[in-house]
A protein has these predicted regions:
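Protein kinase glycine-rich loop
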Residues: 1-6, 11
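ATP-binding glycine-rich loop module of kinase domains
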Residues: 10-38
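Conserved structural core of kinase catalytic domains
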Residues: 58-91
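Activation segment signature within eukaryotic-like protein kinase domains
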Residues: 96-97
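Conserved hydrophobic alpha-helix
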Residues: 100-107
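Catalytic-loop of the protein kinase fold
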Residues: 108-126, 130
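Activation segment/activation loop of eukaryotic-type protein kinase catalytic domains
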Residues: 125-164
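Conserved C-lobe activation region of Hanks-type protein kinase-like domains
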Residues: 172-232
């Protein structure tokens, strides 16, 4: 049964006989399978840590050059948000954001930038065919990359990098052609929180109306969006979150605990 299809892959639901459990099979549509090969490399690296599956990383069952078999998870945050008429309670959204941040921090600790933080890539666990909202996972590492070399050095800052990701939630720097680092994941994370609380983002209408916008144009629109338009009617802590994310440096390790404590203050 087909679950999802994108420009690069098709995802099917299946059933494993030994041991008996539901699985998903992701097939690369590209001739050379480059996108899925990258995702497999990322998953293999993360799962060198035996505790990875307890930190919000989907469990990998098997893989080949053009296919990836994973555990079947529940619905996505996007699915739940749609089913809730684009309305999460404030506290539910913030609690969810804290779980998301914990997973992003873990992915970064493995030397990886996710590169496509958005509601549809966060999946809930599944228990007996039903979504388990206590467990959250971050999926889809097709656009992910290592930000650390094997010797531990950070990748260099670059300009003129082709944009990958989802424009609606992407950071303004990556849309503008700058190399991604941890700050881009956290900027996207900030936009996701705003979206889950308010149900929209300031640039949604412009992105929808102007069909000829390229990534650079979208980045410029985000860069010129005023702070007050993003955090209007939200608690004062969101101004601190905005300033924190907006002043992150390319090479610097983010202070995740500071950000988490700001979120906890709002509960």
């Amino acid at each position: 049964m087909k679950l999802h299809e994108s420009s690069s892959s098709i995802v099917y639901k299946g059933y494993q006989l030994h041991p008996k459990k539901m699985i998903v099979l992701k097939i690369d549509k590209m001739t050379r399978g480059a996108s899925l090969e990258n995702e497999i490399d990322i998953y293999r690296h993360i799962h060198r840590d035996p505790l990875a599956s307890t930190q919000g990383i989907p469990q990998i069952i098997a893989y080949e050059h053009y296919g990836l078999v994973m555990e079947k998870l529940g619905s996505s945050v996007h699915d739940l948000f749609e089913a809730s008429n684009h309305q999460f309670s404030f506290k539910f959204a913030v609690r969810l954001a804290i779980k998301m941040l914990n997973i992003i921090k873990y992915v970064h600790s493995r030397g990886i930038v996710h590169g496509d933080i958005k509601p549809s890539n966060f999946l809930f666990g599944e228990n007996n065919g039903k979504a388990d909202y206590k467990r959250l996972y971050l999926s889809d590492y097709g656009f992910s990359k290592f930000f650390l070399f094997k010797n531990g050095d950070h990748i260099p800052f670059r300009e003129g990098v082709m944009f990958t990701g989802t424009p609606r939630f992407a950071g303004k720097w990556s849309l503008g052609g700058l190399e991604q680092s941890r700050r881009e994941d956290l900027e996207s994370f900030f936009y996701v929180i705003i979206y889950l609380i308010k149900g929209k983002l300031p640039w949604d209408e412009k992105f929808t109306k102007k069909k000829d916008l390229d990534a650079y144009d979208m980045g410029a629109i985000k860069g010129h969006t005023k702070k007050k338009d993003l955090i209007k009617d939200l608690p004062k802590e969101f101004e601190e979150v905005f300033d924190f994310v907006n002043h992150l440096l390319f090479y610097k390790q983010p202070d995740y605990e500071f950000l988490k404590n700001l979120l906890k203050k709002m509960l």
